[in-house]
Regions:
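Extended redox/cofactor-interaction regions of prokaryotic respiratory oxidoreductases
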Residues: 2-5, 169-243, 247-252, 278, ...
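N-terminal export/assembly segments and adjacent metallocofactor-ligating motifs
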Residues: 2-296, 300-375, 389, 406-407, ...
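Short, glycine-/Ser/Thr-/acidic-enriched flexible segments
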Residues: 64, 77-78, 84-87, 101-102, ...
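N-terminal leader/propeptide and maturation segments of large enzyme subunits in energy/redox metabolism
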Residues: 118-134, 292-416, 593-679, 723, ...
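Glycine-rich phosphate/diphosphate-binding loops that line cofactor/substrate pockets in enzymes
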Residues: 136-155, 213-221, 399, 420-432, ...
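Flexible glycine/proline-rich, aromatic-decorated loop/lid segments
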Residues: 260, 556-589
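Short beta-alpha connecting loops at secondary-structure transitions
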Residues: 265-271, 586-596
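Long, contiguous, secondary-structure-rich segments that constitute the structural scaffold
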Residues: 603-647, 734-736, 740-752, 756-840
């Protein structure tokens, strides 16, 4: 097949290699930088030539770091990117290979130069060049026709995490356009199972996945790392893990795979993929049975003493005894009330006023309001006014009693004695638990997170230096609650999770009403690469759309399957503001260093142009500077810092906090009760599209098998290998795939497999092999690795389809998801592997 046209991209593999070789001539634009120069010392603020200028940039993909970088410009061209030196915060001075490679990304030979219209079949790679005016006219005409025929909701925008900034995360101008045409929105459904499991216990006020500042891990006595390969997935946080090791922190890695992170830890525990919740529940059982709980913390800062009615699972309140409903409850001293946090997803309600919760106070032998109790009972079974009750802690203890270490050992393949050892370490504080994105990538993914935050609750290991439990520290985000997008009203059309689109479109219904989706504008996302079950997604969703527009800088898998492709400006070709990241707690100003290349336009200008063609230009008179100023004025953090667009543009980088942040310091939680709610009174789905959920299952952390990747699954006999993902330091969620110097270092999509499994299938080390199941296949290069657990395959995620000999990872991944988390389950898939014998 060598030299033939690739249906995915319209560019042959041979043609791509020629283009890459030809692109070397363009290296003069970036100072002839070679791979060897990556290792050189790059001094901040020091131009290499007298005529060079240095601009402040922020590297802002969804790696989560938002590193400040210097953008060196010579004769109107970016010639180098280097680490910004922030003297007051040397620990955040970082840059990685991706950050260093920005000039190659900007001047990528594959960069889209002008608008393209499809002239062949979708995916054929046949395009024609058109003008921006033609493109905008076509979009306006198609959208008007579709909305007139099918309704306003039939046009939708899809965006996910293609960048972090006001324009690249909040998408204010696109959203205003969508609001004005009353269009639908589509969400990406990625990495939210951890959030559901964690935040329904602690609340959402500290941000998503909340944990202590990464610099705090050095203060832990025991550091647990769960399904997180920091050395590759969180490059900039890795140094803090190393600091902890050097300081003598006892580090334990729980991961099916022997990762680089695991190799540096004091202890590595290989757990069966998808069984993390069973392991953690067993650890809770040991902690309870051995009396290792922090009783005072349980009484004062958790729902442990709350009495749960056996009749309906809700908490016993004063109104249950007085016969007075919540709405009729007097707000006097005798029945003190509290407001449910308006943003709390546990309840799905807004500022409800509830009757006071009651507990059994052993000090006086009576029911009292929880805040008045002196010694509330955390264990016990009671009956009041004919209502049987148990404490929330009793219900937890009963649930975990099913998972003795011996029983859990059968499920998770971890020795019972090891489970006991881990449990005891969890009570020996300070203890930090850091969760990665592995255990949440299964249908049962919320429950490992829910169980782990429950361990922190029952041991009191949260809210002080060295003691935390979470997946990431996003508290430095400035929170752009913009008023710009909804200024003229919000769209009444629905927000749809991408995972539910096949079901919605196939049924033709949403919320019990007829529903049609016929056009999609996709920006800051690449669903045909980064989503799952790509063949079904194409068949049931994309092939049913009458018009697909993709805004991007290169021909992604999704762009290749669209009708119109619009070239967008790169990050250093326009101004933007970022609110900080996991290891960068600065609000940063990204200066415009160069003009947009070729005919590319900024996202704002693209949205404005479409609006003009739709007769809506009068609603888009604000400049980008005014939009950024609006974002800062609506940010509580920026207001506290006294920041405006003008002041930040002058300062460039402004710290949002001093010192090391401690999540939930002083045991302050933003749940309805103000406590850690390991028992969830009112579980709700993270993204509601009218689905049913199992409320009882979600009240407590539980174990149930993954949707597919489990030995007892009916598909296991046919496909006996669990497919697990690993992140690469050379790409970020599908970005940087075409950057030629990084492809020199990482040229081919690969998968790792235990040699015993590979040899049993006749697959040779270094050979191309086919990974397959009933959904599809992909052909990637095999790497033998003893670090991979037998019965597993580990793939490097989000490679563009054109780099495979055939297929792609997105073809073999399962669409099944939990209706509570509505989260992509990237590891919940079974496959098999066989040699690939076809020609290149």
């Amino acid at each position: 097949m060598s030299g033939s046209e690739n249906a995915h991209s319209g560019l042959t593999r041979r043609g791509f290699l020629k283009a890459t070789a030809a692109g070397t001539a363009a290296s003069a634009l970036i100072g002839g930088v070679s791979l060897g120069a990556f290792a050189s010392e790059l001094r901040s603020g020091q131009p290499e030539n007298a005529g060079d200028s240095i601009y402040q940039g922020i590297c802002r993909p969804n790696c989560g770091q938002c590193c400040a970088i210097d953008v060196h410009v010579r004769d109107g061209k970016v010639v180098k990117t280097a680490m910004t030196h922030i003297p007051d915060s040397p620990e955040v001075n970082r840059i990685c290979l991706r950050g260093l490679s920005h000039p190659y990304r900007i001047y990528d030979p594959e960069r889209i130069k002008y608008p393209l219209r499809r002239v062949g079949e979708r995916g054929s790679g046949e395009w024609e060049r058109i003008s921006w005016d033609e493109a905008a006219e076509e979009i306006a005409q198609k959208w008007a026709e579709i909305q007139e025929k099918y309704g306003s909701q039939a046009v939708a925008q899809y965006a996910i995490s293609g960048g972090y900034g006001v324009f690249t995360t909040n998408h204010p101008v696109y959203l205003r356009l969508n609001n004005l045409i009353n269009g639908s929105k589509i969400t990406g459904c990625v990495d939210m199972a951890n959030a559901v499991g964690i935040n329904r216990v602690v609340g959402w006020g500290e941000g998503v996945w909340s944990t202590n500042d990464a610099r705090d891990v050095v203060n832990a006595k025991n550091l647990f790392i769960w399904a997180d390969n920091w050395s590759e997935a969180q490059i900039q946080e890795w140094r803090f893990f190393c600091d902890a090791i050097e300081s003598g922190v006892n580090t334990i890695v729980i991961d099916p795979v022997y990762t680089i992170t695991a190799s540096k830890a004091n202890k590595w525990v290989s757990v069966r993929p998808g069984s993390d919740a069973a392991l953690i529940l067993s650890m809770i059982d040991v902690i309870i049975s051995e009396g290792l709980t922090d009783v005072t913390f349980l009484q004062e800062h958790t729902v442990a003493p709350f009495l749960v009615k056996s009749t309906d699972g809700s908490f016993l309140r004063q109104s249950d005894l007085s016969g007075t409903s919540t709405a009729e409850t007097d707000k006097g001293d005798e029945l003190r009330t509290f407001d449910v946090h308006a943003a709390n997803r546990n309840t799905g309600t807004s500022a409800e006023v509830e009757s006071p919760i009651l507990v059994w106070d052993e000090a006086c032998g009576a029911l009292v309001e929880v805040e008045k109790a002196v010694n509330p009972a955390i264990e016990g079974e009671f009956e009041f006014n004919g209502i049987p009750c148990k404490t929330a802690f009793t219900l937890l203890a009963e649930e975990v009693a099913q998972y003795s270490p011996e029983k859990a050992a059968e499920i998770c393949d971890v020795p019972a004695d090891t489970i006991r050892e881990l449990a005891r370490l969890c009570a020996d504080g300070p203890v930090t638990h850091r969760m990665g994105w592995g255990s949440q990538s299964y249908v049962n993914g919320a429950h490992p997170a829910h169980a782990l935050i429950t361990i922190a609750a029952i041991t009191g290991q949260i809210g002080y230096p060295g003691a935390s439990c979470g997946a990431a520290d996003w508290s430095a985000s400035s929170g752009w609650a913009q008023s710009y997008a909804p200024k003229y009203g919000a769209s009444s059309s629905p927000t749809l999770p991408v995972l539910a689109l096949p079901e919605i479109i196939e049924s033709g219904e949403y919320g019990g009403e007829p529903f049609a989706l016929k056009a999609m504008l996709i920006h800051h996302g690449n669903p045909l690469c980064t989503s799952v079950d790509m063949n079904r997604l194409k068949r049931t969703v994309f092939d049913q759309l009458e018009h697909i527009v993709v805004v991007d800088s290169v021909m992604t898998d999704t762009a290749c399957y669209s009708d119109l492709v619009l070239p967008v400006a790169q990050w250093f070709e326009f101004e933007d503001i970022t609110g900080g990241g996991q290891t960068n707690f600065y609000t940063g100003f990204n200066e415009k260093a160069i003009e947009p290349l070729h005919e590319s336009k900024t996202d704002s200008d693209i949205a404005r142009l479409i609006a003009e063609k739709m007769g809506l230009g009068e609603y888009f008179t604000e400049t980008d500077a005014e939009i950024l100023d609006d974002a800062m004025l609506s940010s509580e953090t920026c207001q506290k810092l006294g920041l405006s667009y003008a002041s930040l543009k002058e300062s460039k980088l402004v710290p949002q906090r001093t010192g090391v942040k401690i999540a939930f310091e002083g045991a302050k939680f933003t749940t309805p009760s103000g406590r850690m709610e390991f028992y969830v009174e009112k579980p709700v789905a993270f993204s509601n599209y009218g689905q049913d959920i199992d409320v009882e299952r979600e009240r407590l952390p539980r174990f149930f098998p993954p949707g597919e990747a489990w030995p007892e699954n009916e598909k296991y006999e046919k496909y006996p290998l669990t497919l697990m993902t690993s992140r690469t330091k050379y790409q970020v969620h599908g970005q940087w795939f075409s950057v030629r110097n990084l492809r020199e270092l990482d040229p081919d999509p690969t998968f790792r497999i235990n040699p015993a499994d590979a040899r049993a299938r006749g697959v040779e080390d270094g050979a191309w092999a086919e990974i397959f199941n009933d959904r599809g296949h992909c052909v990637a290069k095999c790497i033998y690795s003893e670090a991979v657990r037998p019965g597993s395959v580990v793939y490097m995620k989000n490679w563009a389809a054109k780099y495979f000999k055939a297929g792609s990872w997105a073809e073999v991944l399962s669409l099944e998801f939990d209706p509570v988390t509505v989260n992509h389950c990237f590891m919940d898939a079974l496959v098999d592997v066989r040699p690939w014998s076809q020609e290149d």
